[in-house]
Structures are given as C-alpha cells and as structure tokens.
C-alpha cells in the first residue's frame, strides 16, 4: 500500500515539477493513518524559492485530493533539498563536482565504508572522491548506501 502511494505521489510530483521548470529530487511517504507525512523535495539550478515550494504544494495537493490518491489524512511538505542534500542520481555527482561530500557504501572499500572528500568525477558507474590532496578513491555507484553533500562552515 505504502509503495503504491509513494509511486502515485512521485508521478504527480514529477509532472508538476516539470511543468514548473523544477527538478523532483525525492519523495518520501512516512507513517500511516492520520500521522502520514508526504515529503517532496524540489530543486533548480538557481535555487528554490518559497513561492516554488508553495506552487508545487498547491498543485500536487489539488491533484492528490481530486484523485483521492492518499487514503485518510496526511501532511504535505514541500522543500528544497538543503545545503547537505542527498546525492541520489548519477547526475548529482556530476552537477556537484568539486563540492565536499560524505558517502557510505554497502561493502568496504580499502577497509572503510564511509568516506568524506571532494567530488572529483563520475564515469562508468564509478564515483571519484578526492579524500586527500591527490588521493582519489573510486566508489561504485551501485554500492552507495547513503551520500550527501557536506557544508563547510
């Protein structure tokens, strides 16, 4: 049931995001009953505005209500992915080339599962991460368990 709801929300959110010139980053559906939370993350190269979030929220909400896509009550939340956004797609590693990231892989690479460094490239399903000046670790994209940008204070 939860997968069907998530799939429907993704389809609607993708359609709305594209029509508004936005990228759909992620859809999460958590909980159930009256405590269900539907979280949509959107982005665009110049950054997301409050108005972008409001527009997507209004349009997605209207469609979900009209189609009665989510049983019961739910809270709809639309936001930007934030400064420490998740890296979910191969394109993310190319787009954020040169930025700091933290990547956790399923199987150890050189004795470790969690790596931090600067995104140095992405090719043939492999992420290049500069973990020290001149020291590159190659991490298979299909082994990534979790990855996000790291904001430097």
Curated annotation (Swiss-Prot):
> Pfam families under this entry?
DUF150_C (PF17384), RimP_N (PF02576)
Highest taxon of the source? Bacteria
Q: Which GO terms describe its biological process?
A: ribosomal small subunit assembly; translation
Q: What is this protein called?
A: Ribosome maturation factor RimP
Note whether Cell wall biogenesis/degradation occurs among the keywords.
no
Q: What family does the entry list?
A: Belongs to the RimP family.
Q: Which HAMAP family match?
A: RimP
Spell out the coiled coil positions from the record: none
- The scientific name of the source species is Solibacter usitatus (strain Ellin6076)
Q: State the compartments where it is located.
A: Cytoplasm
Naming one, the record's GO cellular component terms include: cytosol
């Amino acid at each position: 049931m939860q997968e069907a709801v998530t799939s429907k929300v993704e389809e609607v959110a993708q359609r709305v995001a594209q029509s508004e010139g936005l990228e759909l980053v992620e859809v999460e559906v958590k909980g159930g009953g009256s405590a269900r939370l539907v979280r949509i993350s959107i982005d665009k190269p110049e950054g997301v505005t409050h108005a972008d979030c409001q527009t997507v929220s209004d349009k997605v909400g209207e469609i979900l209500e009209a189609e009665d896509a989510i049983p019961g009550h739910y809270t709809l939340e639309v936001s930007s992915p934030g400064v420490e956004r998740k890296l979910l797609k191969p394109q993310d590693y190319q787009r954020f080339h040169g930025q700091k990231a933290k990547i956790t892989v399923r199987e150890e690479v050189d004795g470790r599962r969690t790596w931090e460094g600067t995104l140095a490239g992405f090719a043939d399903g492999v992420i290049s991460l500069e973990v020290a000046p001149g020291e590159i670790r190659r991490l298979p994209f299909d082994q990534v368990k979790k990855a996000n940008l790291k904001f430097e204070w």
